[in-house]
A protein has these predicted regions:
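PLP-dependent aminotransferase class I/II
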Residues: 11, 53-57, 65-66, 118, ...
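Active-site phosphate-binding strand-loop segment of PLP-dependent enzymes
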Residues: 122-221, 226-228, 233, 375
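N-terminal "arm"/small-domain region of PLP-dependent enzymes with the aminotransferase-like
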Residues: 1-45, 377
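Structured binding elements
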Residues: 111
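Phosphate-binding glycine-rich loop
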Residues: 45-92, 98, 106-108, 116-118, ...
């Protein structure tokens, strides 16, 4: 494989040119400056303004969801989604160990505990088979109608599967399994804006979903996140909680519960609106890049992570799977030495100090992927 390292570098440079090549750089080729100037001129630069409302409307239209609530980042969207799902302190939430730390952090903010379930190798997302096995062997339904962990005695309230790198997981199966056990599904769609399963946008399968618009995402507004849902009651409470739980009144300040200052500022929303206008262009461009990568890596015998049947990925971050950790590390060192940014997948959550005592299943696929997956440059190509 090391003999192919120069060829891979040449291919990436063929796509992205000379000089330093980042992993995923933002592209501002639309109305970003115009909308920002308009926002500044309006003086409405904080969490009240026309662009916040417009972005929510346009995001809902794009995803096909009935409601979208803009937040300051993806982690805040996850945090509030879990509260809306009814997760409380001392509950447990099923999720994957192979994820970005925000997923587990959001669970911990509530005082709940993550339980880590394995992923499928082909999607890198939560495995329906492993999830079913966990319910069968490790849980019991109580007379109160809730599912409990036999080992800990704690209530399992929610499940957070993530569409890793924008590759849709087998979400219909996950939702079906969770429904049998009275578990609410919150989709972590931080990376999957523009990804579909059977022509339905990711995020519309669970009761709630959380998006991220961080600087390295398919569209960005510097930070930013959003909750989508098709439940009007959840949507209204999401907006209420993210605006400090303030009761509507022309001048009085009355807050009827503990809320959060999580509303997306109008400045960020102005950029987000301009980015969303270009999303179709971004997705088309990234799909062409992924197809070129897929063809090239197939020719040299390297596994490229592709979407599975009946799904459409946004190919946010393209990924390859190498033979072992040694080959992975050699490749990452070689490419970065040649000014091409590549990176390994995240350290598994159960290896981190904060979650080292969390319950897990065997995580066979997660450990296997952790040692082999490498992300390669995936920016919009001009």
């Amino acid at each position: 494989m090391q003999d192919n390292f120069p060829n891979i570098v040449s291919k990436i440079r063929e796509l992205y040119g000379e000089g330093f090549i980042p992993l995923h750089a933002p592209y501002f080729g639309g109305n970003e400056k115009k909308y920002l100037a308009d926002c500044i001129d309006s003086t409405f630069v904080s969490s009240v303004g026309q662009y916040v409302n417009l972005f929510e409307q346009k995001l809902a239209e794009f995803t096909g969801a009935k409601y979208a609530i803009a937040t300051v980042n993806g982690t805040s969207a996850l945090h509030v989604s879990l509260i809306l799902a009814g997760v409380e302190a001392n509950d447990e939430v099923l999720t994957q160990a192979l994820t970005f730390v925000a997923t587990s952090n959001a669970i911990s903010y509530i005082g709940a505990s993550p339980v880590f379930i394995d992923v499928d190798r082909d999607t890198m997302g939560l495995s329906p088979e492993k999830l079913e096995n966990f319910f069968k062997n490790e849980t019991v339904m109580n007379t109160d109608g809730f599912c409990y962990n036999k080992s800990t005695g704690k209530r399992i309230k929610a499940c957070v599967p993530m569409h890793t790198f924008g590759i849709p997981l087998r979400i219909s199966e996950v939702v079906s399994i969770c429904k049998k056990h009275n578990i609410i599904v919150v989709e972590d769609t931080a990376e999957s804006l523009g990804s579909y399963v059977n022509n339905i946008h990711t995020g519309n399968f669970g009761q709630l979903a959380a998006f991220s618009f961080n600087g390295n995402k398919t569209i960005t507004c510097g930070g930013g996140g959003a909750i989508i849902t098709n439940d009007e009651t959840l949507a209204k409470r999401a907006k209420h909680l993210t605006t400090t739980a303030k009761s509507p009144h022309p001048f009085e300040f009355f807050h009827d519960e503990i809320g959060f200052n999580y509303r997306m500022p109008n400045l960020n929303a102005a950029v987000a609106c301009a980015q969303l206008e270009q999303l179709d262009l971004f997705l088309k461009n990234k799909r062409i890049t992924a197809e070129k990568y897929s063809t090239f890596f197939k020719e040299i015998g390297v596994d490229f992570v592709n979407e599975i049947t009946n799904t459409k990925a946004n190919y946010w971050l393209n990924a390859i799977i190498l033979k072992n950790k040694e080959e992975r590390d050699s490749f990452i060192s070689y490419t970065n030495e040649h000014e091409i940014m590549t990176r390994p997948i995240w350290t598994l959550m159960n290896r981190l100090p904060a979650f080292k005592n969390a319950q897990t299943d065997d995580l066979i696929n997660s450990y296997w992927l952790e040692e082999r997956v490498v992300n390669i440059p995936s920016s919009y190509r001009q």
